[in-house]
């Protein structure tokens, strides 16, 4: 039902998520933000069960911020991804597992940009591009065909739009609006939302 996508470039990571909050077959709102700011240069995108997503993402968010307050410096994207994975794995083996799928995007002065894919079973993988949700079945082939490691920001936005247009054409559910952000050495930047006219209007 939900959709996340991330594309890593040579000096940035471009991410997008749909803005629909749904309960069963009912759309509750169409301006829901599924991105959580971990630190100045790390963004966590989270989809899954409605209560689990916010509770787990905010728990990770507060702990990453607590780490900075205690130590005087921020976690790198790699460290944040491994911390998130460990917590998700521990919860999976408890009586209160979280059913969440995640993308973690960030930029580090030494390592450069990074994009991590994580599923609800706490499987973690570093990837040049990634997607979550049923829409991933329709768009991963497009990313595989057109992605290059040296892709410019403009081309990455075009590729993102191509994926979202394919989603509108072939996905049976209505996801009309997407939040888009980019993470680079200067931090997290909001780009214009990508919107499509509602089907049948």
Swiss-Prot record:
Annotated Gene Ontology cellular component terms: cytoplasm; cytosol; extracellular exosome; membrane; nucleoplasm; nucleus; proteasome complex; proteasome core complex
Zinc-finger keyword on record: no
An annotated GO BP: proteasome-mediated ubiquitin-dependent protein catabolic process
Compartment annotation: Cytoplasm; Nucleus
Keywords of the record: Acetylation, Cytoplasm, Host-virus interaction, Nucleus, Proteasome
Name of one Pfam family that matches: Proteasome
Keyword Iron: no
Induction field: Up-regulated in ovarian cancer cell lines.
Location (main, coarse): cytoplasm
Modified residues (N-acetylmethionine): 1
Subunit note: The 26S proteasome consists of a 20S proteasome core and two 19S regulatory subunits. The 20S proteasome core is a barrel-shaped complex made of 28 subunits that are arranged in four stacked rings. The two outer rings are each formed by seven alpha subunits, and the two inner rings are formed by seven beta subunits. The proteolytic activity is exerted by three beta-subunits PSMB5, PSMB6 and PSMB7. (Microbial infection) Interacts with HIV-1 protein Tat.
Family note: Belongs to the peptidase T1B family.
Functional summary from the UniProt entry: Non-catalytic component of the 20S core proteasome complex involved in the proteolytic degradation of most intracellular proteins. This complex plays numerous essential roles within the cell by associating with different regulatory particles. Associated with two 19S regulatory particles, forms the 26S proteasome and thus participates in the ATP-dependent degradation of ubiquitinated proteins.
Identification of the protein by name: Proteasome subunit beta type-2
Organism of origin: Homo sapiens
GN (gene name): PSMB2
């Amino acid at each position: 039902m939900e959709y996340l996508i991330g594309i890593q470039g040579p000096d940035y990571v471009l991410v997008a998520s749909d803005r629909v909050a749904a309960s069963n077959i009912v759309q509750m709102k169409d301006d829901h933000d599924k991105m959580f700011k971990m630190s100045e240069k790390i963004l966590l995108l989270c989809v899954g069960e409605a209560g689990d997503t916010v509770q787990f993402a905010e728990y990770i968010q507060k702990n990453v911020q607590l780490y900075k307050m205690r130590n005087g410096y921020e976690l790198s994207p790699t460290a944040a991804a491994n911390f998130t994975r460990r917590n998700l794995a521990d919860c999976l083996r408890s009586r209160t597992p979280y059913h969440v799928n995640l993308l973690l995007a960030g930029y580090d002065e030494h390592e450069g940009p990074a994009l991590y894919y994580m599923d609800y079973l706490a499987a973690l993988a570093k990837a040049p591009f990634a997607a979550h949700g049923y829409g991933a079945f329709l768009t991963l082939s497009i990313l595989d065909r057109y992605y290059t490691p040296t892709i410019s920001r403009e081309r990455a936005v075009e590729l993102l739009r191509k994926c979202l247009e394919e989603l509108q054409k072939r996905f049976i559910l209505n996801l009309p609006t997407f939040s888009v952000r980019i993470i680079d050495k200067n931090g997290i930047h909001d780009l214009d939302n990508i919107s499509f006219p509602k089907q049948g209007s």
